[in-house]
Amino acid sequence: LECHNQQSSQTPTTTDCSGGETNCYKKWWSDHRGTIIERGCGCPTVKKGIELNCCTTDRCNN
């Protein structure tokens, strides 16, 4: 599985997920800097107030 791993609005980059990982994620939240977006492999548990989108196809998390 190939997932995007760039932060916020940086130039898109991808990573090959290891260990049979089947999910990519994108999570985002807002603070004094604006909206922060984090992407990567897996489907993490997030705290209240953080939006999370998990998906299961290559490069689906941009």
Curated annotation (Swiss-Prot):
Disulfide bonds join 3-24, 17-41, 43-54, 55-60. It is found in: Secreted. Expressed by the venom gland. InterPro entries: Snake_3FTx, Snake_toxin-like_sf, Snake_toxin_con_site, Toxin_cobra-type. GO terms for cellular component: extracellular region. Keywords: Acetylcholine receptor inhibiting toxin, Disulfide bond, Ion channel impairing toxin, Neurotoxin, Postsynaptic neurotoxin, Secreted, Toxin. Its main location: secreted. Gene3D superfamilies: CD59 (2.10.60.10). Nicotinic acetylcholine receptor antagonist. Binds to muscle nicotinic acetylcholine receptor (nAChR) and inhibits acetylcholine from binding to the receptor, thereby impairing neuromuscular transmission. Produces peripheral paralysis by blocking neuromuscular transmission at the postsynaptic site. Induces concentration-dependent inhibition of indirect twitches and abolishes contractile responses of tissues to exogenous acetylcholine and carbachol, in the chick biventer cervicis nerve-muscle preparation at 100-300 nM (in vitro). Belongs to the three-finger toxin family. Short-chain subfamily. Type I alpha-neurotoxin sub-subfamily. This is Alpha-elapitoxin-Nn2a.
